């Protein structure tokens, strides 16, 4: 199958995994994961045909997102106990173009794939840029009691619960910009969680 994208694909390589999202309203079932077999300008050749119809124009046009990264953080046993990452108060640093796969502990409060936990204003200037978070059992990125964080150009694919989550709802001065979220599935309320909308 060949897919034409609307702009140059800088840094994309043969062998990278991509998703082509559904292009029908209220449909996540049309999203398909494929591997790039060739790149010719804006045309990607995929390892096998797409089964669903994907539109390149209109309100619900498909997105093509790259899930591959050079740096990979993943659980050793995705079928067993999954890992998680957490930045605490006075942490320093950020995340740039890394893949987080098979993380997040299902049904456990505070054990998310990427979690900024009660950092207040100490993370000022920190950012998560270009991350790919894949197959999380407990959200993609959670910002909890943390201010001044930038989350930009990230791809979240398959999550239980909210994908991009401001946990208290009182977090301010954070920027979530140009992120893609695909297939965030309904989860159960977490233990001791006071938020009724989860």
Feature annotation, model-predicted:
Residues 1-148, 152-198:
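Beta-strand/loop edge motif enriched in small/polar residues
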């Amino acid at each position: 199958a060949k897919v034409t994208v609307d702009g140059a694909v800088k840094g994309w390589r043969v062998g990278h995994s991509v998703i082509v999202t559904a292009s029908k309203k209220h449909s996540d079932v049309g999203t398909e994961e494929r591997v790039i077999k060739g790149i010719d300008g804006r045309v990607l050749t995929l390892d096998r045909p797409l089964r669903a119809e994907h539109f390149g124009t209109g309100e619900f046009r498909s997105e093509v997102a790259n899930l591959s990264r050079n740096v990979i953080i993943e659980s050793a046993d995705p079928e067993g106990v999954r890992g998680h990452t957490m930045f605490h108060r006075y942490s320093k640093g950020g995340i740039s173009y890394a893949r987080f796969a098979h993380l997040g502990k299902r049904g456990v409060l505070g054990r998310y794939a990427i979690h900024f936990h009660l950092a207040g204003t100490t993370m000022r200037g920190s950012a998560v840029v270009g991350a790919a978070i894949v197959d999380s059992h407990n959200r993609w990125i959670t910002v909890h009691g943390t201010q001044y964080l930038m989350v930009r150009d990230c791809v979240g694919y398959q999550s239980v619960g909210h994908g991009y989550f401001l946990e208290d709802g009182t977090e301010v001065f954070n920027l979530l910009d140009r992120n893609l979220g695909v297939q965030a599935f309904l989860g159960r309320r977490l233990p001791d969680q006071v938020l009724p909308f989860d």
